[in-house]
Amino acid sequence: GCIEIGGDCDGYQEKSYCQCCRNNGFCS
């Protein structure tokens, strides 16, 4: 699933882990 908005991606940048992960490592 996608991490909540504003949540840390824990270093993962792949969309399979975080639907809208930006380059700063946070979901948007």
UniProtKB/Swiss-Prot annotation:
Localisation: Secreted
Signal peptide: none
Cited Pfam families: Toxin_34
Alphabetical UniProt keywords: Calcium channel impairing toxin, Ion channel impairing toxin, Neurotoxin, Presynaptic neurotoxin, Secreted, Toxin, Voltage-gated calcium channel impairing toxin
Presence of keyword Membrane: no
Protein family (similarity comment): Belongs to the neurotoxin 04 (omega-agtx) family. 03 (type II/III omega-agtx) subfamily.
Protein name per UniProt: Omega-agatoxin-Aa2a
Species this chain originates from: Agelenopsis aperta
